[in-house]
Amino acid sequence: MSQEFNVVVLGASGAVGQTMIEILEERNFPVAKLFPLASSRSAGGTVSFNGKQVEILDVDDFDWSQAQIGFFSAGGDVSEKWAPIAAENGCVVIDNTSQFRYDNDVPLVIPEVNPEAIADFRNRNIIANPNCSTIQMLVALKPIYDAFGISRINVATYQSVSGSGKEAITELAGQCSKLLQGLPAESKVYPKQIAFNVLPQIDKFMENGYTKEEMKMVWETQKIFGDDNIVVNPTAVRVPVFYGHSEAIHLETIQPAEAEDVKAVLREAPGIELFESNEEYPTAVTESAGTDPVYVGRVRKDISHSHGINLWVVSDNIRKGAALNSVQIAEVLIRDYY
């Protein structure tokens, strides 16, 4: 990777954009020049990169022919407007929104799961980053899927407020502070109080009674695995945790598997840190927050189903669930296609 690339981070003032810039530096991505971009409201500020302060530029004034790789994390409307323009000017867009995920000609990629799909970036010069909850689930399930097959996935998520952005983090902190002082909590980001509470709604409700967040996990799992026969039954829940998503997953495998068989394939899988004993298990706060792996624990045989396996999966939704996965896509892109 001696070649260097001019890199755009669109949404550089947001939590995911800032983390992308940190990870580009941490992983020594070959950046010739970094262009942090944002709306006019956020332009003029700076970000730190490789020991220097780099000015955040106004996306409206940017010449896209200057960049070869663009990381987009500024919302679906922004990606809808700017990704085609960037792509037409030769910038490969790695988009962290849901704008292009379900387009048949746009690859949806988790490098540990389906890196070969990146080859299809040539269709439109756009690669989609999956939803955070899908990413950590499929990193954990890919080795099981390959070894035993999976016919059905039941999953309940416990998703931190950082998945809703900086305003949600501020709202949780503010509500906690007020409630502990005996004052009423005000809710703006969420429909109900999030502090000391759990909300069984993430995103809007669909006609079938599932939320859009839940249906993302269905659609994305089938697309990434290339398997329309796999059945996914999700319930997505927002919990009063700042960083890190957790998932309780029940699988039905095609071939029967014991817990030790599943642990054996997880032990060798990329991107996974396995907790093997019953007494040790990962949590979003104590293990995943601020780290890169997908953590798996509580692996056990389902006592109610002969082909059932249960496991507990946690990961940092801002890192592996968004920024890190995007940078890993770019690493495969420049390694295999440049």
Swiss-Prot record:
Gene3D superfamilies: Dihydrodipicolinate Reductase, domain 2, NAD(P)-binding Rossmann-like Domain. The active site is at C132 (acyl-thioester intermediate), H245 (proton acceptor). It comes from the Bacteria. One of its GO terms (biological process) is lysine biosynthetic process via diaminopimelate. Phosphate binds at R101, K216. Substrate binds at Q159, R238. SUPFAM superfamilies: Glyceraldehyde-3-phosphate dehydrogenase-like, C-terminal domain, NAD(P)-binding Rossmann-fold domains. The keyword Amino-acid biosynthesis applies. GO terms for molecular function: aspartate-semialdehyde dehydrogenase activity; NAD binding; NADP binding; protein dimerization activity. Pathway: Amino-acid biosynthesis; L-lysine biosynthesis via DAP pathway; (S)-tetrahydrodipicolinate from L-aspartate: step 2/4; Amino-acid biosynthesis; L-methionine biosynthesis via de novo pathway; L-homoserine from L-aspartate: step 2/3; Amino-acid biosynthesis; L-threonine biosynthesis; L-threonine from L-aspartate: step 2/5. NADP(+) binds at S13, G14, A15, V16, R41, S42, S162, G163, N317. It catalyses: L-aspartate 4-semialdehyde + phosphate + NADP(+) = 4-phospho-L-aspartate + NADPH + H(+). It holds the Pfam family Semialdhyde_dh. Keywords: Amino-acid biosynthesis, Diaminopimelate biosynthesis, Lysine biosynthesis, Methionine biosynthesis, NADP, Oxidoreductase, Threonine biosynthesis. Its EC number is 1.2.1.11. Homodimer. Catalyzes the NADPH-dependent formation of L-aspartate-semialdehyde (L-ASA) by the reductive dephosphorylation of L-aspartyl-4-phosphate. Belongs to the aspartate-semialdehyde dehydrogenase family. This is Aspartate-semialdehyde dehydrogenase.
